[in-house]
Amino acid sequence: MVSTDGVAQGPGVASRVWYAGKRMRLEAAEAPAGPALILRLDLGKAWRLDPDRKVATEVDADRLRSRSQMDAALAGDLMGGAEEGRVRTAPLAGLRRIAGYECHGFRIRGPSVVMDLYLAEGLGLGIDVFADFIEWSGAGQSMGALLAEIRKLRGFPLQTRSRVVVLDRVHETVSTITKVRVGPQPRAVFEVPAGYRLVVETDEPGKE
């Protein structure tokens, strides 16, 4: 959910995410059989799946990271996240139950950003999973000291809330995991389905 000066900017986005090691799959929650994105961090590859057309488009991982780096560099500059010594972390009082797990809260504060994270330690996942994905996306360098503070925390974040002040306006983003299932994941979840036509992403609009 994204808001500006306390006013929601739309209904928010709900997603389903599968994770196993360095493999991820993302789908829209309202369309479980719809388009999906498969990220294979172990292979340095990504595919967009189009079930209607039975097409899997291979996304250039370097290009994807470059786009993320440009967006993250701007965001990092606005947040002041790369400035060493200007980011501090403090625990938040009390516990919060999220997706059935007791979570401890921490507040990371920078020059113009405040980030609250609520982390669960009973998932068998650590903060490195979250931080490694940020690094892979190319956002790690621009976040600098902010990411370094995140890496010091224990557990996996089930809720993150960031508040950034830009030109005297407060922009807030909240991400909450509402349901967690822990267990072995089918290999097929992270692979291109049989029968799909493989194409490579190009720079030309309307062409693959």
Over which residues does each language-model region extend?
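Extended soluble regions of mature proteins
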Residues: 1-208
